[in-house]
């Protein structure tokens, strides 16, 4: 009664299924007001490109939670959306246009932004197709974009309110500057890596002609902006020169020697040039000493007029020319090559320039304090694993003001205008009425500013009467990587606390990074990246989802390998095959699964239903604790080991027998267990479970809306569990003996079971059909009083010893000759190892691991030899 193919084919199983779910509106919330709401908003992927394995991991966890809660009866919302990803997307589009010979400045802002929208539309469609291939049960009727009308309204509201509260301000500060993209960068957009560089040791002469001091710098091109040289307070070497003036080499400007706590007297010469416009520490020193700030570079990284004859040169070109001139003029003492960590733009790859710039900032301390205070309350955000709460607290305790303006065209335009005549600043959600007299700030907001509002802006805020906001906010869980706790998670928390007085989500579930098989981070440079869509094409979405959830723990990295994907496919194929077996063994008029009659259970039934009960309880508990790897192991062990390896095999006795009543009971049990397994696994592997569930007798249009399995008190039976475990141990022990003596399962053998006490005898007596079916005994003797035969294979299990006499199974003379030959081989191996290990040259000079390996081999050979000698003795005594 089945149309299931003999072999699991994920492409056939998954083809068209997602569209069927969409057509049935199965992804929308139930709208049942009696049900508890459960919501997750998807961490919005950037529209810069396609999804990677990290996205697949994120969403596999989220969708598993949503499907699990939906089946538990919750009113679930899984809200989709994407991020405009300002700098990242603009950089991609600019690179594309450059290949076409186009420049955004020549195109103009409006035309360029239209090009970016076209890019967004293209990649949004790609991302949605990838979501569908992953099987994500997203409610597309609520899809959001960080630049859509509703979110733009929320962004303006937040900016204006923070400005009016004095928490947003405009000022000059040192920021990370990308000279290629000509914009400020947030810290997360700066990648630090080791570069070859140099310390340039330069003479700074005293203005009174009394000599010079030696200054070491890695960026001599910034010396045009030097306004002081600093020493550590109280440094005895320099106490007599503090207050004196120096002449800036090649420039001629006089600068003072000052004392400041920023200087480390142990580092270098203990003298530091201070360039307030080009170094964050120097900026603070300059503020403390009221030093002038001199910016020496243009936006594109070329030198400005402050650099004199070097004006117009690229900063690195200037460095080379300046060092040459310093040498010719006698100011250069030496050049000391070094390797040092230098910040690079994540997007353009160029060295970032610390640079003074007028930017918009968020005053962070008051907002961070709210987060710290909330984490002490009952309404705190729970972190899984818990240790990452300390990461959040650390960032909030050591927070700096957040630069939120970006010199880009793609993004939320800052809602600030400057009066053309008076220079007055106006900040508002709407433009000034006399707009002709005002000019809007050309900058846009940092992408993180809008994504920080994601959990509540997607629910209709600032309209607090919006039905979605009232029902589904705060959300229940955020699933993301531990690497963006500061850059995104913390910002969502403080914005939500400030504007809604609520935490944005109850739980933050963190995962690590997906690495390659060798443990390396996946990257373009290594060429080890994996496209999740390629994996799905080969193995199916269910196998990828199973891999991503099974065997992983919250907060831990995982390694991708095709060996693991093979194992995932094999497990699903096992479920496919056992489902096919069960369905094929059902009668034509089989009814949907219903609660079985436990009074008719035999031992195997009592055992499997107790194991099923335990598995359902554990998987449900572990899902609730976000321990998906542990839940996967519980499910795997039950399905593969208990159900497939044992209960199915035991059931074949009844299914192939003549007792129609017993056969019917087994069929009812099998359909119930299979139904429960498919429901249990549906949140992780939605496609195959839907296909299999619809192929068996069922009620309802989709397994997605079926109820999740629950435990039943009447299925609990620890006695049956223990008794069946004993029976299984007996069967496994005899099977192992058969393998050791090469006795095929078709042959009959004598089996003697010596019980520690007779309490377990009834287990074997009452299940003699199963014992005979699995063990094929010629003669079975069970007693507490059995003497071990002289020639026998023995196995010891809890509660019993098992003997299989070998007299009729082996030719004693042939076996003896074989064993003596094996003993000679092992003696030779032991002698070889002894000789090698007694060689002092080998022991003293070979790597420790090699020596230890040799010792392990010798111990293994000695152990094998001992067993062979015992076998020889037994054979001799049997003659």
UniProtKB/Swiss-Prot annotation:
It is found in: Cytoplasm. GO terms for biological process: valyl-tRNA aminoacylation. Its EC number is 6.1.1.9. PANTHER family: VALINE--TRNA LIGASE, CHLOROPLASTIC_MITOCHONDRIAL 2, VALYL-TRNA SYNTHETASES. CDD domains: Anticodon_Ia_Val (cd07962), ValRS_core (cd00817). The lineage of its organism: Bacteria, Bacillati, Bacillota, Bacilli, Lactobacillales. The gene is valS. It comes from the Bacteria. Belongs to the class-I aminoacyl-tRNA synthetase family. ValS type 1 subfamily. Its main location: cytoplasm. It is an enzyme of class 6 (ligase). Pfam families: Anticodon_1, tRNA-synt_1, Val_tRNA-synt_C. A motif ('HIGH' region) lies at residues 45-55. Monomer. This is Valine--tRNA ligase. A motif ('KMSKS' region) lies at residues 521-525. Gene3D superfamilies: HUPs, Isoleucyl-tRNA Synthetase, Domain 1, Valyl-tRNA synthetase, C-terminal domain, Valyl/Leucyl/Isoleucyl-tRNA synthetase, editing domain. ValRS has two distinct active sites: one for aminoacylation and one for editing. The misactivated threonine is translocated from the active site to the editing site. GO terms for cellular component: cytosol. Keywords: Aminoacyl-tRNA synthetase, ATP-binding, Coiled coil, Cytoplasm, Ligase, Nucleotide-binding, Protein biosynthesis. It comes from Lactobacillus acidophilus (strain ATCC 700396 / NCK56 / N2 / NCFM).
